[in-house]
């Protein structure tokens, strides 16, 4: 079964034969039509007590840095949503109010990222007049991040492939109220034109070639932060203000059809 922060996508059913002489039982998997395969590398589930767990097959450890700036909101669709409310938006060296997914020792995770991946967020944003808070990132001399450029109100997906390779949506105009966005960044593992794509609310908004080649460079700090960007050990930079319901990483380049299905599922 899929995570309980999304619709059920598959179910396993056991069938036993009626034969008395040779009763047999077998399992079959029933798949929801049009379903998107689950995220292979990270699928975050937020819990009522402020902890979080990874429902993907990778089962990455997720460490919560609790504090008054991090709270949970119960939600009928997602179970619980994480709310980040830092004292100072975009602050560096914060020590509470975020999560860390450390992959320093996980070479399988690193190799999966290195040859192409997708990041998915369902996140709120608002015009706070600040510069570039990050809802999820592993950035700094390499890595990747999704950034809310709230000085001009647009989203950026920026993997480091030869150099920083920012892919930006067009400006969204005024965003005076907290607004939900489905943001998906994709890199297909190549150095070709259109290898990097950025989708917003189910539609492609930008694409480009990597800055140079097709070699993904990891930063020194090999961990993702949810609610900010990777900083020093047990710290986060670029503190984010908003709510996050979905945070996933896929070991593949999602297609336009898959991204649209993911967005449509959220809107059901």
For each feature predicted by the language model, list its residue ranges.
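Extracellular glycan-interaction surfaces
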Residues: 63-94, 120-130, 145-214
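Flexible glycan-contacting loops in extracellular carbohydrate-active proteins
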Residues: 208-243
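Extracellular glycan-recognition modules
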Residues: 37-42, 48-56, 88-157, 190-195, ...
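Short, surface-exposed loop/turn segments at beta-strand-coil junctions that are enriched for proline
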Residues: 1-7
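Extracellular/lumenal carbohydrate-interaction signature centered on repeated Trp-anchored short motifs
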Residues: 103-119, 172-181, 215-218, 237-243
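C-terminal edge beta-strand
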Residues: 22-35
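A short beta-strand micro-motif common to beta-rich folds, especially ectodomain repeats
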Residues: 7-19
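Extracytoplasmic low-complexity segments
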Residues: 34-91, 206, 260-268
């Amino acid at each position: 079964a899929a995570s309980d922060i999304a619709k059920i996508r598959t179910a396993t059913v056991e069938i036993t034969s009626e034969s008395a002489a040779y009763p047999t039982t077998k399992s079959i998997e029933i798949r929801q039509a049009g379903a998107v395969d689950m995220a292979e590398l990270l699928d975050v589930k937020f819990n009522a007590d402020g902890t979080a767990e990874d429902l993907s097959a990778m089962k990455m450890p997720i460490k919560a840095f609790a504090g008054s700036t991090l709270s949970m909101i119960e939600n009928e669709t997602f179970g619980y949503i994480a709310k980040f409310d830092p004292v100072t938006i975009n602050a560096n060296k914060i020590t509470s109010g975020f999560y860390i997914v450390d992959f320093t020792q996980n070479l399988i995770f690193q190799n999966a990222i290195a040859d192409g991946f997708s990041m998915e967020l369902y996140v709120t944003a608002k015009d706070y007049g600040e510069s570039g808070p990050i809802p999820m990132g592993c950035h700094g001399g390499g890595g990747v991040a999704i950034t809310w450029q709230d000085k001009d109100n647009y989203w950026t997906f920026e993997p480091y492939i030869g150099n920083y390779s920012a892919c930006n949506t067009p400006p969204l105009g005024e965003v005076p109220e907290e607004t939900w966005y489905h943001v998906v960044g994709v890199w297909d593992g190549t150095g070709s034109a259109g290898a990097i794509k950025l989708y917003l609310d189910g539609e492609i908004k930008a694409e480009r070639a990597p800055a140079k080649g097709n070699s993904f460079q990891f930063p020194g700090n090999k961990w993702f932060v949810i609610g900010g960007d990777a900083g020093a050990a047990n710290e986060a930079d670029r503190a984010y203000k908003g709510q996050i319901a979905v945070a996933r990483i896929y070991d593949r380049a999602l297609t336009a059809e898959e991204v649209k299905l993911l967005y449509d599922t959220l809107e059901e």
